[in-house]
Every structure is written in C-alpha cells, then in structure tokens.
C-alpha cells in the first residue's frame, strides 16, 4: 500500500482528496493535517465521509508525518509548500503540490505574479508539471509534481491539439472562463457570500489573474514559442465546474468534421478527455464529480475563428482528481485507478 499524508486536508481540495483516496485500492491514508480542526475526527468536519475514515485532524509535525508517509499532498495557499517540499525531498519521499509554488520554471515569473519570495527556487527545475495529457512520461516516477491550476487545465486541454499542429495564430487566443464558487476555497469572504453570489454573474481579476502566466507558459511549450493570451475569469452561482470558451484564429479555417477528427485523434488514448461529436456542447453538470474534461470544437465561418469549449469539475480534473491521476503515474499504477465512475446527474 502507498502511505499518503495530506497537508491542509480540510479545505475543499483536501476534502476531495480524502474522498478519492479512502476508496483507492492501493492507498492507506496515514495523516490529515489541519490548522483549524486539530483533534477533531475528520468525518465531523465533513460528515459525508463518516464510515470512510476514522482519522483525526492533526497539527502539522512535518518530520513525523514524513516518517509515516511515502508521499505527501500539499493543499495549501501559495507560498506555504516550499519548506514542506524541501523537507520531503531531503528525506527521499515524494510530494504532489496542489498549490502554485512549483508550477513555473522561472522564479521571477512566480514572484511577480504571486508577490511572495520563492524560498525553494533550487527545486523548480526538479518539479514536473502535472498535466498527464501533455507530460505523462515525465510524471512516471517523479518525486515533485506541480499539480496544475483549474483554469489552466481546462484551457490547455482545449487548445493543445490546435497548437501542437500549428493550426492557429498563437498571438490570437482569447479565453473566457466561468467557475463555480468552490474554486475560491472554503474560507469566508464577501465575494462568495450567498447573498452576493446567488443570482449573480461577475468577472473578476480581469487581466491580472494569477493563472494567466501558467496558461501562457504551458501553451508556449506546445506552440514552440512565447505567447500571450487574453484571459478573463468569471464567477457563476454554482458550486462546482468550469466552462472555458476559447476563441482562436486559424490561418485556414477547417470544417466541422476536420476539427472533430483532429481532436478525436489527438485524445484517442486519453482516458479522461471526452471529445464530443459535432452538434454536442460541453456542460458542467456532465462532468461534475468526475475526472473528465469534455471538449467541443466549432468553426465559425462568419468570423474565421475556431471556437473551443472545455468543461471540467474544478475540484476534480481541476485539482484533486488530477492529483490522484498523478499519484498513479508516479507509482506505476494504471492512471485511472480510483477515478473511474460517472458523475451525479441531475
């Protein structure tokens, strides 16, 4: 059994990790840390997990937790995983970080967007960006994995076939994305207060969202050149889900069937990417609670654009589900282990 500890287990991504790992056939949970619920049984914090784990939340004692675990997940705010990573790797163990601390090759990019010093910059070259669909081989056996952000996951999967084939202008990409409120985390804030969010639809962090450079770095790798995207996120009154609508400009506009075949062929062997046939469009409810990404690609002859639509569950393929997929790859398991189930509908 793979012994797993979770640092920061009582946020939404931590809870989703616990939900997935309690039913994973090759995992034993050995520690769940929390600053807010020390001594509480985990199921008292999240009652839906009663009878699935009897672990109590514990204060972080990193050396002791590392001794017990083969791998740690960190589900912490940015800036808090650096010291954890250094300790874990120095002890010969593995780390999957669900935060942003190891997603960038360039320390200066991280520091300019996240406004904190990177105190473990020597580990950045060692980190593997954890999007299996573009980085699978590098993830096998990796000891430090930077789990992607939710918006980048939806955006990169939506654009990868077009950029890999060189069919679109890399300087003409517009990403318009909508997310449910769980993406903001479990902490209380006016922005996610029921009375502020219900029956409301709002843009936020226009032009300055911290996922922008992450999207640009990974799309630039696919395109083979630096690029800039226009990215605008929106908050919508639902709990889970991201829907990204992506506008691109090709040199020559393919027809509907050509685009479908391009995407279907590119993702043919991918267990969690579903390319919808012409006439069907992604919807967040169809992926809720699953590790799937649903894609559709549509030509717009009137404007000469190719429009891509990408839907994921921000807590699953956008966070914890993808982290478990990465865990499976790290330890040489079938990457779908513990992740094959339909979502809830309606």
Curated annotation (Swiss-Prot):
Organism encoding this protein: Desulforudis audaxviator (strain MP104C)
E.C. code: 1.2.1.38
Enzyme class: oxidoreductase
Subcellular location, principal: cytoplasm
GO terms, biological process: L-arginine biosynthetic process
GO CC terms: cytoplasm
Keywords, ordered alphabetically: Amino-acid biosynthesis, Arginine biosynthesis, Cytoplasm, NADP, Oxidoreductase
NCBIfam families: argC
Functional pathway: Amino-acid biosynthesis; L-arginine biosynthesis; N(2)-acetyl-L-ornithine from L-glutamate: step 3/4
Function: Catalyzes the NADPH-dependent reduction of N-acetyl-5-glutamyl phosphate to yield N-acetyl-L-glutamate 5-semialdehyde.
SUPFAM superfamilies: Glyceraldehyde-3-phosphate dehydrogenase-like, C-terminal domain, NAD(P)-binding Rossmann-fold domains
Active site, per annotation: 150
One GO MF term: NAD binding
The name this protein goes by in its record: N-acetyl-gamma-glutamyl-phosphate reductase
Superkingdom, taxonomy of origin: Bacteria
Family note: Belongs to the NAGSA dehydrogenase family. Type 1 subfamily.
């Amino acid at each position: 059994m793979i012994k797993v500890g979770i640092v920061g287990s009582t946020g939404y991504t931590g809870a989703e990790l616990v939900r997935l790992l309690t039913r994973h056939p090759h995992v034993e949970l050995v520690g769940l840390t929390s600053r807010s619920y020390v001594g509480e049984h985990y199921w008292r914090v999240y009652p839906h997990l009663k009878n699935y784990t009897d672990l109590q939340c514990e204060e972080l004692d990193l050396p002791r937790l590392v001794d017990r675990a083969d791998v740690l997940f960190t589900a912490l705010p940015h800036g808090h995983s650096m010291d954890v990573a250094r300790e874990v790797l120095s002890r010969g163990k593995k780390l999957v970080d669900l935060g942003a601390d190891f997603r960038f090759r360039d320390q200066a990019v991280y520091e300019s967007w996240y406004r904190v010093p990177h105190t473990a910059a020597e580990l950045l070259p060692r980190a593997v960006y954890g999007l299996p669909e573009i980085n699978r081989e590098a993830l096998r056996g990796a000891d430090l994995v930077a789990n992607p952000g939710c918006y980048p996951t939806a955006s990169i999967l939506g654009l990868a076939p077009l950029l890999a084939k060189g069919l679109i202008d890399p300087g003409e990409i517009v990403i318009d994305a909508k997310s449910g409120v769980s993406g903001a985390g479990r902490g209380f804030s006016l922005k996610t207060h029921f009375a502020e969010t219900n029956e409301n639809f709002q843009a936020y962090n226009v032009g300055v969202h911290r996922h922008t450079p992450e999207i640009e770095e990974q799309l630039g790798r696919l395109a083979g050149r630096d690029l800039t995207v226009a990215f605008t996120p929106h908050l919508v009154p639902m709990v889970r889900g991201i829907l990204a609508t992506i506008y691109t400009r090709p040199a020559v506009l393919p027809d509907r069937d050509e685009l479908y075949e391009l995407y279907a062929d590119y993702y043919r062997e991918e267990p969690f990417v579903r390319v919808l046939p012409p006439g069907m469009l992604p919807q967040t409810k169809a992926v809720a609670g699953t590790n799937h990404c649903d894609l559709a690609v549509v030509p717009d002859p009137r404007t000469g654009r190719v429009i891509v639509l990408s839907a994921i569950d921000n807590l699953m393929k956008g966070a914890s589900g993808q982290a478990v997929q990465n865990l499976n790859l790290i330890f040489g398991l079938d990457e779908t282990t513990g992740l094959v189930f339909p979502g809830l509908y309606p």
